[in-house]
Structures are given as C-alpha cells and as structure tokens.
Curated annotation (Swiss-Prot):
Coiled coil: none annotated. Residues 280-342 are annotated as: Catalytic subdomain B. The keyword Glycoprotein applies. It comes from Drosophila melanogaster. Belongs to the glycosyltransferase 2 family. GalNAc-T subfamily. Residues 30-563 are lumenal. This is Putative inactive polypeptide N-acetylgalactosaminyltransferase 12. It is a single-pass type II membrane protein.
C-alpha cells in the first residue's frame, strides 16, 4: 500500500502537475469568463464558499502529503489545494461602513501602487490572494500591481516552466501590466519592500502579505484615511483565516502597543474608544500584513537602518519612524482583510534554527534600543538584560538620520502615542525573575531550547547563550529570546511557542520555598537531560527543584505569585 501511495504521489508531482501547467499555458488566451477561474486540478466546486469552514476526509494514500504540507506551510495546505481559487467571502463590516460613500474622484484621494512580497508560498494560496485582490478592488483605486519574489527556492519556484506559468497566469488573469520581480538572491522583507517602493509610480503605496484574502470595500477606507491627513499610515482590521479549515473568522477591534521589553501587545479598546466604532482610531504599534502609506513619506523613512534583518524588526522600527516624523498609525475598522496566520509553534518549525533567529532578533532589538529609546534604554534593558552583552554594530548612519529628523525623546512616544494605556500591565510592571533556570540537583545544567525537537532540554550553562536567558514576566509567562515562551504540551512534555500572554499552558508560578516551577496544578520535573515534563507536585522530589538566578521576592509577594 505504501509503495502504491508513493507511486501515486510521484505521478501527480511529475506527470499530472506538469501536464496541468502545460494545459494552462495553452489556455491562457481564453477568456476567464468561459473558464470560471482556473479551479485547479484538485479543487471541489463550492468548497469554502462565503468563507465557510471546509471539511474533507484525507484518503489514506494522501496522508503523507497532508502531513508534509502541514510541516512546511504551517496550515492545511492539502485542503487549500481543494478550495477553488475564487471563492466568496462574508461581509463582516459594521452596517454603517456598508453605507459610507467615499469621494474617490477627489484630488486628495490618490490611487495606489499595490505591492506584495512573497517567498516560498504555496501556489494556490498565492493565487487565491491575487484573485481576491483584483476581484474586490476597483481598478480606479490602483494603477499598478508589483509582485516581488524574494528568491523562492522550493521545487515549484525553482522550475523555469513554473515561473513562466506563474508570470503568464498573473498577466492574463490577475493584471495585464503587473510587474513581477524575481530576485536573484534573498534580500529580506525590509529591503524587498524598499526595492518595490523605489519602482512604484503611484502617490500612495499599499503593502500586502501573500497569505491574505480581501473583502469587499477594503481599500477605499484606507486611501480615504491617508487622504484626510498627511503623514498617516492606515491599516485594516485583520480577521483570521483558520489554518485547519480556512474559514474566515471575524476578529474584534483591539489596539496595538509595545511593552517595556519592546514586545508587541494587543490590548482591548477602552469603553470610550469602543463607543466611537466603527470610526478609525490611533494605535502605537503597526501590523504590516496590510497597510497604506503616502509614497513620498515612505521613501523618506525607508532607509533609517538598512542593517535590520526581519524577525520582529520591520514592524517595531516602522512604528517608531512614523512617530519620529510626526505621523500617526490608524486602524480602520471599515476595512477588513482575512489573514492566514499559522499557530506560533508551527511558525517556529518553518524557520528551523531558532538559535540564529534569537540572535538575529536580539541584535535587531539592540540596534533599535540604542538609536530610538534615549534616556529610557536602561529601563528596557532591565526587561532584556541579555541584550547588554550583544554587539549592535555600527550605528552612525541610523543615528545621523534620527538627528536629521529631529525626533523627540522616547518619553514623548510613551506620553503622546500611548495615552490611556496606563492601566495595561505592560507599561508599569516589574518582572518576577530573570536569568538561568537551573536544576538544584545539577546547578551547572540550564534549561535550553531545542530547535530540532521543539522541546526543551538541559545543557551546560553559558552566559553567551541567549536561549538560556529566561524571564518570569509580569504576565506570568516564562520567556526567552524576547517572545518565545515555555509551554506545556497536551502530553505534559515541556515545549515552547511564541508568547500570547493569555495564560493557559503558558502560565507559570515559582515557589521560592520548595523551589518548584508550576504550571497550573502541576510541577516541572526532569528524569534526564532530554526528558522534561509536568508531573504531580511533590516537594520531596529533588527532580522538581529549580533555581532562578535573579528573583524579585518583593514583587512576587505583592502580586501573590508565590504559592
């Protein structure tokens, strides 16, 4: 049976798919209306219509394909191939949004260049994004579409015939004058955006991710918002595309901000702010999955620090640059876009070497702190002490640009951009402990992340290993490398995921008397260096006793975190 399944997979990969591509190339001259939108060789008509959840049983001979797709794409890629490229979506806007009329012919509301950066995307998801874009965006609201392939290197994107197919398909069915740039080497999100922006012709730029689906009326509110006031960056509400069923799910309106560790937080809107919905509201932290911005302004602020490399840098620096140049970030509830955001744990698997990711993010944060935060950097280093030992590199150019723009102090950012958020713990709380997490039995062994197994293990302690520098934070999670948290798996083994600050399996307490680390009702225990798990608490069990380097007992006691 396994041999048969393997033969079927090979036939599809090397015979069916190439033949399908060849047929598509032959049919590219036909009208889209007569073909009903290239369903794809595996799609099921009607599946996922109106953004509904899709359910299909996976045949036994396709289990391997299903599993491998999950491991790489971080969502149900097997199902994604079976949902038509063109599907309807629900209109989840407030009823008042649907009645609004925008002066789209005014001189102030300029059309945009729409820019998409992608790398190693699943073809059907990318094409579904593009179809939803062109079919739900009036042509007079944008003058060009720029697609930048940041040196994709998976099987499909490495094949010349596949690139020909993609380019021809886009020009025939998406936009006849779309500009497609296939970069010869990977440059990263920030540089790819800057490159595309330098090529753009419109007075406004709209950047979009490759894993989104657009709803009716998404673009007009964004362009209207940036037309009303100069130096405005506008973002939509990002709804959720479920990674298992691809269902379109409504998100509630929230406000982005940064805490003292420069970690992004989503906090509820105040009652006063909610009473003014669905009108736009200002936020402190931008989400760059979809955003609109005046082109000249973006060019002015795009080259602050060319040495930042992705992974948490783009959104953080852009938020600061907007504030520095007298701008504002505005969330627009009348604009809604579905976003396929995989679970954090799966997201980690895709990028592999977590140690390098942690080093990269730490260096990014160090550069941003040294350039932007001024007198308050000591407060931030208190939450990120491991950054003190990291080299930030040459900062002459970003500091020069910072001074040229006459940026105000970081205190002004806190006071001006985050008013009314003082009730949020992130702004004024102190963490409970930081440093190494060691076993009392083997005090030279420290809790460390294993990027390959997705588990945690014990390794010889090192002051230079950023993946051993833990913080028991004010929100009672145990985090490392800025935004990675220890998490209890359903099988009670200890793993990790990106922090969500919502408790649950990421909630931790420390008992300084018994030296036990507790998550909910169970205690952290080890049997050897590779086996760390949660078990019934036993104060007499030496393998449940842990040491945290720097414990703030007074804060623990005042917060009643001590058990």
């Amino acid at each position: 049976m396994e041999v048969f399944a393997s033969v079927l997979n090979c036939c599809f990969k090397y015979i069916v798919l190439p033949v399908w591509i060849f047929i598509v190339l032959l049919l590219l001259h036909r009208d889209l209306s007569s073909w009903d939108g290239l369903m794809g060789p595996l799609s099921h008509p009607g599946l996922g219509e109106n953004g509904s959840a899709s359910y299909l049983s996976v045949p036994s001979w396709e289990i391997d394909e299903y599993t491998q797709g999950w491991r790489y794409y971080l969502y149900n890629s097997w199902l994604a191939e079976r949902i038509p490229l063109r599907r309807s979506l629900p209109d989840l806007r407030d009823h008042r949004c649907q009645k609004l009329e925008y002066d789209e012919d005014s001189d102030e509301m300029k059309p945009a260049s729409i820019i998409m950066i992608f790398r190693n995307e699943q073809l059907v998801v990318l094409l579904r994004t593009l179809h939803s874009l062109v079919e739900r965006t009036p042509k007079y609201l944008y003058i060009e579409l720029i697609l930048v392939n940041d040196h994709s290197d998976t099987d499909f994107w490495n094949d010349k015939l596949s690139l020909i197919f993609f380019d021809n398909y886009v020009h025939r069915y998406i936009h006849p004058k779309a500009r497609i740039l296939h970069l010869p080497e990977q440059v990263g999100l920030i540089k790819a955006r800057n490159l595309a922006a330098s090529e753009a012709k419109a007075e406004n730029l709209v950047f979009v991710d490759a894993q989104v689906e657009f709803t009716n009326g998404w673009l007009s509110p964004l362009l209207d918002t940036i037309a009303e006031q100069s130096y405005t960056l506008a973002t939509p509400i990002l709804d959720n595309l479920d990674e298992q069923t691809l269902a379109y799910q409504r998100s509630i309106e929230r406000r982005g901000m940064y805490d003292w560790s420069l970690t992004r937080r989503e906090v509820p809107l105040s009652r006063a702010r909610r009473s003014h919905l669905p009108w736009p509201y200002e936020v402190a932290a931008v989400r760059t999955s979809v955003f609109a911005i005046p082109a000249v302004w973006f060019q002015d602020i795009s080259n602050f620090d060319n040495n930042l490399r992705g992974f948490g840098a783009a959104e953080l620096e852009l938020s600061f640059k907007v504030w520095c140049t007298g701008g504002r970030i505005v969330q627009v509830p009348c604009s809604r876009v579905g976003h396929l955001q995989p679970k954090d744990e799966d997201y980690l698997k895709r990028y592999g070497d977590l140690h390098k990711m942690g080093e990269q993010k730490s260096r990014n944060l160090k550069r941003i702190i040294e350039v932007w935060t001024g007198d308050l950097k000591s407060a931030i280093y208190k939450y990120q002490p491991h950054l003190l030992n990291i080299s930030e590199g040459d900062l002459n150019e970003p500091r020069k640009l910072y001074k040229q723009n006459e940026c105000q102090s970081f205190k002004e950012f806190i006071n001006d951009i985050t008013p009314g958020l003082n009730h949020v713990a992130a702004l004024n709380r102190t963490d409970y402990a930081s440093g190494h997490v060691k076993t009392l039995e083997f005090p030279k062994k420290c809790l460390t992340i294993n990027a390959k197994s997705q588990n945690l293990f014990l390794e010889r302690c090192s002051t230079n290993n950023t993946l051993q520098n833990w913080t028991l934070t004010y929100v009672k999670d145990l985090r490392v490398a800025g935004n990675i948290c220890a998490e209890v798996r359903p099988n009670l083994r200890l793993g990790y995921s990106f922090c969500h600050s919502l408790g649950g399996r990421q909630s931790w307490h420390y008992d300084s008397v018994s030296n036990q680390l507790m998550s909910n009702t169970k205690c952290l225990e080890f049997t050897d260096e590779l086996n760390i798990f949660l078990a019934i608490c036993d104060a007499a069990n030496g393998k449940q006793r842990w040491i945290l380097d720097n414990i703030n007992l007074s804060v623990m006691q005042s917060a009643n975190i001590l058990v």
